[in-house]
């Protein structure tokens, strides 16, 4: 097993990493938990909030609005200044889905006002315009169809393909958007362990939550109840990994979101981990040194599946 991914050319000198506590600046972010959507300042103060139910995906928009899910099947855009929903799309009703079991756990705003939406249950990925017109649709390959768990996060790649975290199948699949064919897939390993039920640190499985494509072509995967993040090559070789107890003083539980920052750091979502564990962890993948954590369990509770940093200059992969 390689010590460092081929994506990273960082030279590490042990004498540079002696601090026992996180040393990076804190982040401003938007997050949902305990029945509220909130913007948290870098100093930890809540600078904005409104009542809002649970989410699995979130996107800060260039106009200063935020796009989130509302309920099980609706995508909504909120004007932060007024706290009003200024646009929405209900997958339970639109474009042939009326009367069908549908849940939405992933979506993404695209260029020209298009929105990509992954519809679990009916098993498709669609793109719509802001009038709700169906512009494209593509069927998902599903080994174990599930209205609640067909997908977690889905992202459209620069080449136009879809990278899909298919939770119930335990697989990442990359689809050619034009043909619907799977052009690459990876089954998240169980690492020789038996599946265990639950949502917290005691659980185990390969019900992944997110996958992002790195600039070098490797894929970074948040394994959900696998309590880990792994990086795999196009040839499906694991070249980097961090597991449940690899980070001192931190227990990973349901590992959800991934943000790859311009400085190559990873920000990892740590859901259902219980009090005493951070909700977000920023680490340097070259050293696995934790450089920042977000620990607001008392404010946001034990179910914080998604968030987004708001103060990072440059392109973030998420």
What annotation goes with each model-predicted range?
Residues 1-6:
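N-terminal secretory signal peptides that target proteins for export/translocation
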Residues 7-20:
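Bacterial N-terminal signal peptides
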Residues 24-318:
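Histidine-/acidic-rich catalytic cores in large beta-rich domains
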């Amino acid at each position: 097993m390689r010590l460092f991914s081929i994506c990273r050319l960082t030279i590490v000198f042990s004498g540079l990493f002696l601090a026992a506590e996180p040393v990076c600046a804190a982040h401003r972010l938007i997050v949902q938990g305990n029945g509220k959507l909130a913007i948290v300042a870098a100093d930890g103060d809540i600078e904005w909030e409104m009542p809002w139910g649970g989410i699995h995906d979130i996107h800060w928009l260039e106009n200063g609005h935020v796009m989130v899910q509302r309920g099980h099947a609706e995508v909504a855009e909120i004007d932060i200044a007024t706290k009003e929903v200024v646009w929405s799309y209900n997958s339970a009703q639109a474009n042939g889905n009326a009367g069908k079991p549908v849940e939405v756990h992933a979506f993404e705003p695209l260029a020209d006002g298009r929105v990509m939406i992954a519809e679990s249950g009916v098993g498709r990925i669609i793109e719509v315009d802001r009038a709700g017109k169906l512009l494209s649709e593509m069927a998902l390959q599903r080994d174990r169809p599930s209205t609640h768990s067909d997908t977690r996060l889905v992202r459209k790649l620069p080449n136009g393909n879809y990278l899909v975290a298919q939770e119930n199948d335990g697989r990442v699949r990359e689809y050619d958007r034009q043909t619907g064919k799977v052009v690459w897939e990876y089954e998240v390993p169980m690492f020789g362990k038996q599946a265990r039920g639950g949502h917290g640190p005691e659980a185990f499985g390969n019900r992944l939550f997110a996958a992002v494509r790195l600039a070098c072509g490797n894929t970074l995967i948040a394994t959900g109840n696998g309590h880990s993040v792994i990086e795999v090559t196009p040839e499906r070789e694991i070249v980097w990994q961090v597991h449940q107890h690899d980070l001192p003083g931190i227990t990973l539980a349901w590992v959800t979101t991934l943000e790859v920052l311009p400085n190559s750091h990873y920000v990892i979502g740590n859901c259902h981990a219980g009090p005493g564990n951070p909700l977000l962890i920023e680490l340097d993948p070259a050293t696995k040194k934790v450089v920042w954590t977000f620990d607001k369990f008392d404010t946001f509770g034990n179910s914080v599946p998604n968030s987004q940093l708001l103060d990072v200059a440059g392109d973030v992969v998420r």
